[in-house]
Amino acid sequence: MSYERERYIAELAVQRATILTQKVFNEKAKGTVSKDDKSPVTIGDFGAQALIIQAIRKNFPNDEIVAEEEASTLREDKALSAEIWRLVKDIKLEDAESNELLGGSLPSEEAMLDIIDEGKSAGGPKGRIWALDPIDGTKGFLRGGQYAVCLGLLEDGDVKVGAIGCPNLPVDDAATISSSIGVDQNSGAGNGVLFSAIKGAGSVSRPLTSGARAESKSISMRPVPDIAQAVFCEGVEAGHSAQGDNAAVAQLLGITSPSVRLDSQAKYCSIARGAGDIYLRLPVKKDYQEKIWDHAAGDLIVREAGGQVTDIYGQTLDFSKGRTLAANKGVVAAPKAIQDEVISAVKKVLKL
């Protein structure tokens, strides 16, 4: 099976959802809210989830969906529900044929709430299951930095398709990723990338558009002949990865370049196209289990670009255990040629 149709629908669904998330940012988040006000994220999360699940339901009605949000909050908060509906109801791709493929406009606010609730699958080892993160990188979203709309298809626990929209990443693969990438990008000119992969068929990127799908080009991780020259990509939030341990791993490997800090699965996408080399997400809490929607699409995109993705013990990520990566601890992603060396350094630092 080729999975080309699944990839096509996933890309269009993600693309349409990013039209909403950018609208929410510009109307609700930009310069008007304190960082403690989560309502723009809430609105974007629920709205993007509704739009993407609608597209999956229209094209693959029997597939299951694992998503983060449930509509019970909205059924209790009528004002919030009405505001989300106001923003969602007119969102469409400018290309009519592409938009119809996704099911067109949602018919009503009630239909929107019902469809949000279709993301409650428990996951597991059998069947076709979509893992959806409507806004990955909530703090990045609020500060106008990096966030991603992420969708992956699992079949019998194996990731077959991944699509990630990064509205604030530069389209140019060769663009220098500096520390400023994490703030105030505001989907400026030259920003907005859609990454995707099919298992066994490589990874591609294309510019995000508001209409039909743009032309793609294949992407791959860059060779790292000297590990000391490698560049780390890591999270901005200290609560998501143990940054002191990350620094110790870098030191052990002789890496002196400053780490690039960015939110969301944009980290997976950045190393997949050679704008960085190593992504570490080292455990902060002993009992924390990573959510499958935070990793499914990025895991495949990196592997299909010539990388390897494992946990801190060197085990591949197991997406068959339900809604979390219950069998894994942490994440280490790097080019295949240096993965063992990175894992070895991680084990030394974490005393595994």
Curated annotation (Swiss-Prot):
InterPro entries in the cross-refs: DPNP, Inositol_monoP_metal-BS, Inositol_monoP_superfamily, Inositol_monophosphatase-like, Inositol_monophosphatase_CS
Catalytic activity reported: 3'-phosphoadenylyl sulfate + H2O = adenosine 5'-phosphosulfate + phosphate; adenosine 3',5'-bisphosphate + H2O = AMP + phosphate; adenosine 2',5'-bisphosphate + H2O = AMP + phosphate
Residue positions binding AMP: 240, 264, 267, 281, 294
GO molecular function per UniProt: 3'(2'),5'-bisphosphate nucleotidase activity; metal ion binding
PROSITE patterns: IMP_1, IMP_2
Function of the protein: Phosphatase that converts adenosine 3'-phosphate 5'-phosphosulfate (PAPS) to adenosine 5'-phosphosulfate (APS) and 3'(2')-phosphoadenosine 5'-phosphate (PAP) to AMP. May regulate the flux of sulfur in the sulfur-activation pathway by converting PAPS to APS. Involved in osmoadaptation.
Enzyme Commission code: 3.1.3.7
Entry's induction text: Down-regulated when grown with elevated levels of potassium chloride.
Name of the protein this chain belongs to: 3'(2'),5'-bisphosphate nucleotidase
Keyword Metal-binding appears in the UniProt entry: yes
GO biological process terms, semicolon-separated: phosphatidylinositol phosphate biosynthetic process; sulfate assimilation
Ligand binding (adenosine 3',5'-bisphosphate): 138, 240, 264, 267, 281, 294
Cofactors required: Mg(2+)
Positions annotated to bind Mg(2+) 1: 68, 133, 135
Highest taxon of source: Eukaryota
Family: Belongs to the inositol monophosphatase superfamily.
Cofactor note: Binds 3 Mg(2+) ions per subunit.
Residues bound to Mg(2+) 3: 68
